[in-house]
């Protein structure tokens, strides 16, 4: 979908119109172990995205956020190798997470790609700050295009400080300031990690971009243990934002690329000097939001919608229950 300067490509897989894996994305029958399925599928997916962007007068370099889903963590490194062929430098903010399965049989990769075709390319600026730990994947911590700021998904990891200070603990990539002592009952891992991500990582990048936490209009939150951690996440969200929370989506996934991480958060924000207005929307006639955030946030001409499920304060609504 293209709207004004924005381009949104969603659910791009290496499939045909019947949602069957394309022949060029399948390993050769006689040599099944000579090529990786994710490498083959990645070339089809990235070529498709590049083709769409070219048809719109742009390129992959117009990307401001890339969301990648794999069916195995083992596919991350082969995918990254292929990605460098298409974007050898200036890679946009990114998140990459494993999931149990994708909707097309045989698909091991799915990509969402957001781009901004700015009328004036000089308004695009790559955001980098040493106040937040650098990322290992080579992508930008953030990108600002005009009024808009897009940040990469951030976990509580700090790869420069990976050893655990706690006796008896497993190895962890979580930053010391985001850890709780496993030898004590005190503290919440999810709450410590969310607070660290938002204040020490995303907050620092936003400040470098001319923005702040209160200017966030959309947050994508990936949880590896949603049944255990959703309440703790909501506690921190409520404390951070009060009644000015961004539109928030909750995405259950299978893990992260940093040992010990339980959450990853990517955000979209407006700059402090943005001319666009912001409206938080809660609709009284439908079930209240599932967490401490509005149903949606309208920022400029874009509408960002929070997670919506068929539930109210008592659980699943009657009209959504099976008829047996």
What residue ranges belong to the model's regions?
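N-terminal presequence-like segments and the immediate start of the first folded domain
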Residues: 1-47, 51-199, 203-217, 224-324
């Amino acid at each position: 979908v293209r709207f004004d300067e924005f381009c949104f490509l969603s659910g791009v897989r290496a499939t045909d119109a019947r949602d069957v894996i394309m022949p060029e994305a399948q390993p050769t029958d006689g040599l099944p172990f000579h090529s990786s399925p994710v490498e083959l599928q990645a070339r089809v997916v990235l070529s498709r995205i590049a083709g769409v962007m070219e048809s719109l007068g742009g390129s992959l370099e117009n990307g401001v956020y890339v969301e990648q889903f794999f069916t195995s963590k083992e596919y991350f490194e082969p995918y990254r190798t292929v990605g460098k062929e298409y974007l050898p430098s200036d890679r946009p903010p990114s998140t990459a997470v494993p999931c149990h399965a994708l909707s097309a049989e045989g698909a091991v990769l799915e990509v969402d790609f957001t781009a901004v075709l700015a009328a004036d390319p000089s308004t695009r600026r790559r955001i980098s700050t040493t106040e937040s730990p650098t990322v290992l994947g080579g992508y930008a911590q953030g990108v600002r295009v005009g009024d808009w700021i897009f940040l990469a998904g951030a976990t509580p990891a700090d790869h420069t400080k990976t050893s655990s200070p706690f006796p008896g603990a497993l190895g962890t990539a979580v930053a010391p300031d985001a850890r709780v002592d496993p030898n004590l009952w005190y503290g919440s891992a999810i709450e410590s990690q969310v607070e660290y991500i938002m204040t020490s990582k995303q907050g620092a990048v936003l400040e470098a971009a001319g923005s702040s936490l209160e200017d966030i209009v959309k947050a994508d939150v990936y949880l590896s243990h949603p049944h255990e951690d959703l309440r703790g996440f909501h506690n921190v969200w409520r404390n951070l934002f009060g009644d000015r929370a961004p539109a928030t989506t909750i995405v259950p996934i299978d893990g992260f690329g940093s040992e010990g991480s339980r959450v990853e958060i990517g955000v979209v924000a407006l700059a402090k000097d943005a001319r666009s207005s912001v409206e938080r929307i809660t609709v009284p006639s439908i079930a209240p939001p599932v967490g401490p955030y509005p149903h949606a946030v309208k920022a400029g001409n874009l509408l960002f919608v929070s997670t919506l499920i068929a539930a109210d304060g008592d659980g699943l609504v009657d009209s959504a229950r099976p008829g047996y």
